[in-house]
Amino acid sequence: MGIVYLIEDKNNNCYKIGVTKGDPVKRLKKLQTGNPSELELKYVYECEYPFRLETMLHTQYKLVNELNEWFALENPNEFLDKCAQLNSIIDSLKCNPFFSKKFKIKRLS
């Protein structure tokens, strides 16, 4: 299992969509170090294939991408619903033999 998270940059109205195998609060603290902007952990979503979900979220929001993993989201409150929606797609695909190899490589223990 892993965690996909949404962190808000309060000064720039941007959101980071990221993934961690560890504690998202520790990840926030690492990002905050040396960063003059105030960052806040908004949402976390635990799932079996966090790297796949993160990639799908980045693709979903590519039109509002600011820089790397930072996005200008209009409605960040939809993040958990979007995670659940995309995660259900991942769940349905993981049993498909054409996709199962990729999923086994990316799976976290």
Language model: regions and residue ranges:
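Non-catalytic accessory segments flanking enzymatic or RNA/DNA-binding domains
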Residues: M1-S109
